[in-house]
Amino acid sequence: MNLQFLFIFIAFCVMLFAQIVTAKPVEAEVAQPKLYQRGEGGNGMEPIPEDVLNEALNA
């Protein structure tokens, strides 16, 4: 029983080590948040144009 447990434990450690070694770093692409305004006639939301947004932020 102890030998079987030892074998399973070693196999688990080897599999865990293989997962860690072969893991690729996750390169998360951070999306720029967009600000929205009410569309023409209230038909939903549309993104604020960047030039208008920059002008408002720099005022």
Swiss-Prot record:
<protein>
    <recommendedName>
        <fullName>Salivary thrombin inhibitor XC-43</fullName>
    </recommendedName>
</protein>
<keyword id="KW-0800">Toxin</keyword>
<keyword id="KW-0732">Signal</keyword>
<feature type="signal peptide">
    <location>
        <begin position="1"/>
        <end position="23"/>
    </location>
</feature>
<keyword id="KW-0964">Secreted</keyword>
<keyword id="KW-1199">Hemostasis impairing toxin</keyword>
<comment type="subunit">
    <text>Interacts with human F2 (thrombin).</text>
</comment>
<comment type="function">
    <text>Anticoagulant protein that acts as a competitive inhibitor of host thrombin. Inhibits thrombin-mediated host platelet aggregation.</text>
</comment>
<keyword id="KW-1201">Platelet aggregation inhibiting toxin</keyword>
<dbReference type="GO" id="GO:0005576">
    <property type="term" value="C:extracellular region"/>
</dbReference>
